[in-house]
């Protein structure tokens, strides 16, 4: 069966081909202290990744019905085929009889051993910025530094799904689908001005921004409801349904902002700063935020610093308008889940996130050691996140139908972006650096430690307990790195040790365990052939430290592999990844 790879399902990073990135940066001296500049980038890559394996005797909506019996299509057009309605998947003689009956059809005829879809895509990113900077020479604004610029950025993700079916099309389904595209376009215009008045520095400016999120529909076969949808077959390219014309469109928003920033050297030892920013959105949102900060030189070698600020993050146009259908795990079972704008399910329109933060720290020079230590606390209210998957209620189905969602009655699970919970994150960052001469060269040693603790202060109405646990425990509280960077005349090298503390590991957004701490080591050596050309060889996780293995809990089908984990060996949320050791060879050329 060519529809099934060996192994049937692969966990890990996708295949990336034709990965190309180009940057440029240029400037032109215009005289009198002014400069024109341009910079930009372009990148493109093809991605090919695996999806969940479709079991030929168990995948609902494809091979079986909701009651577990085999899903059989009557292809006569008038339901006169007298096809079996309660055939057990283990009855292979009955299956073969169905295959031999021209009035009946099962997808096993096209994929007798099941199949594993391949999710493919082409990703392009591009941006371009041009501007002019300098200092105003005459008039009432003489001595004012300026920077005026405009930029445009574009990201396009074109999706496809291969080696799958639109089950509702039965024997007429193609196997490969073009499912559509997302395009994000951003345009900005900035004017930034600043001037010093004795011990006081003043900065102010204006920003205009327009963002457009576009959904391009896929080919018809990727989203259409075929003739067998009414018999229980899933609609659309199975695994990631195409974007229909009903969900396609361009969704734009404009906003402008003005800001002011004042800093004053109150005394030789004390610097204070205050900033204010007002932002207005065409969607009707507006906000005013501020920042207060200080730096106090306690002694020649020790300084204290601190800040307090408020923040605001409006929902993106993508979050507010995204529509897609894909396969996901719900309570350990594969199912089709659709992501919809919340208002199409009768939920409230998305509102902005608001945050308040505090930070306090110390900067010290202790002989040849530079040390910084900062405590921080961040409270975020009305956080924007996807809800857990759940079967739509009758009221939600009615809202979906009223909003024009096609085949609403066939959608098994839904989720949507919503403002539903609040969090409080606090922690400590400590960084120490030391420079010396060792082994006939210059040596930089650095150590960094981070402690971060996140608490869900208000769970809201739709955020599940399991999601709260992932938010609070899904990342290590303790992280640390130690780096040794060595430089000789033509050779440089570094060794870095990475420490990850205990965390709550989750597999496929379904179940988890408390994972042990671990350490990885990265190394790299670079040789400068000349002033322009260099080559590097290195490794990430050189000792091949494994991620946390899935434990042998109830329902285990083998050592370290519980039931229904779809071939996974490691918990996929490991902070160090599940790929193991990665070696690389690279070359660089500086123009």
Language-model segments: which ranges?
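Outer-membrane beta-barrel signature, preferentially recognizing the C-terminal barrel domain
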Residues: 239, 243-255, 301, 311-379, ...
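Repeated loop/turn-to-beta-strand initiation elements of outer-membrane beta-barrel proteins
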Residues: 33-36, 139-146, 199-202, 269-272, ...
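Transmembrane beta-barrel wall of Gram-negative outer-membrane proteins
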Residues: 1-113, 117-135, 140-141, 528
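Gram-negative outer-membrane beta-barrel transporters
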Residues: 376-508, 586, 590
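C-terminal beta-signal and adjacent terminal beta-strands/loops
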Residues: 380, 499-505, 526-591
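Outer-membrane beta-barrel proteins
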Residues: 1-31, 47-51, 104-125, 172-188, ...
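Outer-membrane beta-barrel transmembrane domain signature of Gram-negative proteins
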Residues: 117-123, 127-128, 137, 150-152, ...
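Transmembrane beta-strands of outer-membrane beta-barrel pores
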Residues: 20, 42-46, 136, 152-156, ...
